[in-house]
A protein has these predicted regions:
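Short, acidic, metal-binding catalytic loop of nucleotide-sugar glycosyltransferases
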Residues: 21-30
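GT-A fold catalytic core of metal-dependent nucleotide-sugar glycosyltransferases
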Residues: 67-69, 87-139, 152-154, 161-162
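Conserved nucleotide-sugar donor-binding
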Residues: 159-171
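Short internal beta-strands
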Residues: 32-40, 133-134
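Short, charged/polar "capping" segments at the starts of alpha-helices
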Residues: 40-47, 141
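Active-site beta-to-alpha loop of glycosyltransferases that engages the nucleotide-sugar donor
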Residues: 7-13
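A glycosyltransferase accessory/donor-loop signature
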Residues: 7, 169-333
């Protein structure tokens, strides 16, 4: 089993929690190869991660220096926001970053937790698809914004099982690079939109239990529909199954949930599970990350809690699904 992450040095304590949750829940797997595409890690953090993974006899750890995604692949990426890192594009170049003998790999964002065996999912039959993933909750205006056809499904790129053999055989890295250059280095939602646009109808859709993200837990079915106007999505029963028995949990950010589990004062629904696995890492005694929310973000969080959730979702839903796509379209011209 091959697992790959990318991480900066500052996020190592969070990544450690994700890795230990996988190793704890997959002891029956013969071999787990953990690849970390690292961006300027300290030697101390590398040693601590080696010590963590070294406790599991079925696990191997490999560090790979993060390429300069812009220069090495000549993508011409534009820095629209200072917080955006081009490192996230590395998941679309795993065919060349990882060795040729890796023909299947599970890519995970660092903000994920494993809550069960990955074996069944990892062995998914690709059926000539490039990847397997979980649908993100987006409305039709976003599909139109990205010129995606009516049969396509937009997946969250924080968890993707890649068919690297097909990826390499079809020279998808060139396709990705050519597309990004054709957009002058700017694609909204970055690599997530790139992979969805280029792999339309070639991502195998799997059960949401393999990427149970915060939205699924924070809102009722009706309020989620009010908030996101999503029509190309899972059934209510599938979402219930994912929330009640998730295998991969994605600790995504959200305006309605205060903080994420590694932030001081957070109220995330999976904070206790996160802390359970954090206690098994070398970073267990380090303080949680400080809350860096500015006053506007704190005001929004407080305001939306005052309104009935259904009313709040209707208001925010109009902004997110009507005003925002039009604003994005103008910015892309």
């Amino acid at each position: 089993m091959n697992i790959v992450y990318h991480s900066s040095n500052s996020f190592v304590p969070v990544l450690g929690v994700s890795i230990v949750s996988i190793l704890q829940n997959n002891r029956e797997t013969e071999i787990i190869n953990v690849y970390i595409i690292e961006n300027r890690w300290t030697e101390d953090n590398k040693r601590l991660m080696e010590a963590l993974v070294g406790k599991y006899s079925n696990a191997n750890l490999y560090f790979i220096p993060m390429p300069n995604m812009n220069e090495d692949y000549r993508l011409g990426l534009k820095q629209i926001k200072s917080i955006w890192l081009f490192d996230s594009y590395s998941r679309l170049f795993l065919g060349s970053i990882l060795s040729e003998n890796v023909d299947r790999v599970l890519y995970l964002d660092c903000d994920t937790l494993c809550n069960g065996s990955l074996r069944e999912f990892y062995d998914t039959d690709f059926e000539d698809n490039y990847a397997a993933g979980v649908i993100d909750c987006l409305s039709d205006p976003y599909y139109e914004l990205f010129d995606m056809d009516k049969n396509s499904r937009y997946c969250n790129s924080g968890m993707l099982l890649f068919n690297l053999k097909k990826w390499r055989d079809d020279n998808m890295e060139k396709t990705v690079a050519d597309y990004v250059r054709s957009k002058n280095g700017y694609v909204f939602f970055m690599e997530q939109s790139v992979v969805n646009i280029l792999l339309q109808n070639k991502i195998k859709i799997v059960h949401p239990r393999y990427n149970t993200y915060t939205l699924m837990v924070a809102f009722s079915h009706d309020n989620l529909r009010r908030l996101r106007h999503c029509t190309r999505y899972y059934t209510d029963s599938e979402i219930d199954e994912a929330v009640n028995n998730p295998v991969i949990i994605h600790l995504t950010n959200g305006f309605y949930v205060k903080g994420r589990p590694w932030i001081e004062g957070n109220r995330h629904p999976f904070r206790n599970l996160f802390m359970k696995y954090r206690a098994l890492t070398p970073w267990k005694d380090e303080p949680l990350f400080p809350d860096k929310s500015n006053w506007k973000q704190k005001a929004v969080t407080a305001f939306v809690k005052i309104l009935p959730q259904s009313v709040m979702c209707s208001i925010v839903g109009w902004v997110y699904n009507v005003w925002r796509p039009n604003h994005i379209r103008k910015s892309m011209k």
